[in-house]
Amino acid sequence: MATDTQKETLGFQTEVKQLLHLMIHSLYSNKEIFLRELISNASDAVDKLRFESVANADLLAEDPNLRVRIEFDKDTNTVVIDDNGVGMSREEAITNLGTIAKSGTSAFLEQLSGDQKKDSQLIGQFGVGFYSAFIVADKVTVETRRAGVAADQAVRWVSDGSGEFTIENIEKDSRGTRIILHLKAGEKEFADNFRLRHLVTKYSDHISIPVEMEKPVYPEMDEEGNPKPVDENKAPEYEAVNSAKALWTRPRNEVTDEEYQEFYKHISHDYQEPLKWSHNKVEGKLEYSSLLYIPSKAPYDLWNRDMQRGLKLYVQRVFIMDEAEAFLPPYMRFVKGVVDSNDLSLNVSREILQNDHAVDSMRSALTKRVLDMLGKMAKNEPEDYQKFWDEFGNVIKEGPADDMGNKDKIAGLLRFSSTHTDAAAQTVSLADYIERMQEGQDKIYYIYAESHNTAKNSPHLEILRKKGFEVLLLSDRIDEWMMSSLQEFEGKSFQDVTKGKLDLADQENEEEKKEKEEKAEKMKPLLDRMKAVLNEKVAGVNSTDRLTNSPACLVVGEYDMGLQMRRLLEQAGQKLPESKPTLEVNPDHPIVAKMDSETDEERFADMAWLLFEQATLSEGGQLEDPATFVSRMNKLIVQLSK
C-alpha cells in the first residue's frame, strides 16, 4: 500500500540556527567528535528501548539483538550510524531534531563571545549531540521508525543545516533510527574502515551496547596460492568493534584513565575532561556500583532551578532513567555519573525513588563518597581543589543548610577570602583560620557585605585589624544564609562582627576596661541627644571601642537578621517585622568631639543625621533620601568654609 508522505518543509528553531553556525566554526578542529556524539545518542536510544521492553516485551520481538551499526561507502562518500533502538515518531523527530528542548538556551547563546577557543568550550559544555553531524556533513538524512508502530509510520528527515529541514512519511522495515551523513568533499577520510574503527575504540569502547561494523572478508586461496572468487551475493557479517561491556561493571584496575575520561564525555556530553572521579562497588545488605564524576567546568545552567541533574540509573545493567535526582542532594547537582543497583525494581519510578529506604541508604553513602573525594582533593591536590572551588564553591555553600548530617564535612571544604591577605580570591579554609588564631581567641570572626571591597573596608574591622584578629570576608549572596546554618567549627563559634557586642574582653587588661567605662559614662549626655534626633531610625546610640578611624557604624542585635539579608528579602517582596539597628560612635573621633560641644541644635541634628547616613553607606546600604543627605553635606561645607 502506498504511503501518504505528507512531505513538508519546516524551519529550525532560531537557537538551533545559531548553534549550528557557531558549532560548525568553533568545533571544526575537533571534528571527529561527531561519531562519538552520534554513537552516544544511538546507545541512549537502545537503552530506552530496553527499558520500555520491560513493560512490553513485544517491542523486542522483531529483533531482540540490540546494537548500533556503522556503515560507510567510499563511492558515495557517506557514513551511516544505524541503531535498532526506540526510534522516533514524526512529532518526536520534529521536536528532537528541529528544536533544542533545553531551558536556558537563549542565555547560553548570549554567553558566546566570538572567541573560537572560549566558544568551543562553552558549546562543549552545552552538549552538541545530533548537530555535530553537520561539522563533517553538508547533508544529513535521518530515517526512523518508533518501536511498536507499523512499517508505514516511519519518517524521513533531511537537512543541509542551513536553516530548514524536510520531513515526510516513508516505509521502513525495521524499528530504530538510521542517520546517513553525506560527507563534505574535504571529509572523505571518515568513509574509511580503519579510521572509523579507530574512532569507535577511541571514544566508544566503554559503551555497553555492541557497536558493529562489517566484518572484513579475506578471500580464500586455492592450491596454487591464487584468491578464490568472492560470493558477491553473500550477506555481510558484522562484528562488535567495541568491548561492549558496561565500564562501571569492570574492576577498577582494569579500566584506564582514558576510558574513564571517555565514558564521562559519553554520559555528560561534555567534551572537556573531568576533574576527578570515583568508581566503587558495594556488596552486602545493599548491592550497587557507582561511578561519579566531578566536572572541570560548571555548566552554563548551574543556577537554573530547572537544570537537568542527577545520575543515570541502571537496575541490573538495564537503563531506567536519566537525571535520577534522588541519589544526591541538590548542592551536588554538578556531579555526573552512573549508579547501577541490584536491589531496586525494574519498574521503579521517580515517585518510588523518593520513598525507598534502599535509595535513602544509597543517597547517604554516595553523598559521603563525593564529600570524601572532595576532601582528599583539598588535602592532596590543593591546586585542583581551588579550580573546583572557583567553579562550584557557591553551590557547595548550599550544603550546610541542605545537609545537616554532613555539615562538619562540608564546613571543612568551604573556602573564604579574609583579612589575612585582603585578596578577593576565596582560598582560606576554616582550618587555615584556626591555625592562625590568637592565643585565647575562641571565635571565628566574619563580616558579610554586598561586595568584597565593602567588606574589607568596613569600619567594623578597625579594632580587629588593630589587634591582629583575622576576619573572614563574605560577599556572595548565599553567604549570610550559609552562615546562619553554621554554629561552630572544631569547637570555635562564629561571630558576625556587625552583630551585637564585639566581645574582645579576654584580650583587654583591667586598665583598658576601666578607661572604656569612664569614656562611656562621659559620653552619655551626647548619646542621649543623638538618640533623640535619630529616634525614628535607630534602636539606640552607644559608645564603642570597635572603631579606630571611623566616627560611627551600624550594629544589629546578636540574634537579629543581618542588614544585607534584610535588604535582599525586602527586595524580594517579603514583609518583615520592624527592626532598627544601633548606631555606635567612636568617642575619640574629632567629629564626635565637635558634636559634644555643639550648641546649635539644628547643626547638631544635621551632624547626627550625617553620621547615621555615612554609617549606612559604609556598610553597603542605600539612603532613603539621597537629596537631603547632599543638602546637609553642602550646608555643613559652606558653614565650615566661612
From Swiss-Prot:
Subunit relationships: Homodimer.
Region (A): 1-350
Chain intervals for the UniProt region annotation (C): 568-642
Residue ranges, annotated region (B): 351-567
HAMAP family linked to this entry: HSP90 (MF_00505)
SMART domains for the chain: HATPase_c
UniProt-recorded name of the protein: Chaperone protein HtpG
Subcellular location: Cytoplasm
Record's function text: Molecular chaperone. Has ATPase activity.
Chief site of localization: cytoplasm
The species this protein was found in: Marinomonas sp. (strain MWYL1)
Entry-linked Pfam families: HATPase_c_3, HSP90
Entry-linked SUPFAM superfamilies: ATPase domain of HSP90 chaperone/DNA topoisomerase II/histidine kinase, HSP90 C-terminal domain, Ribosomal protein S5 domain 2-like
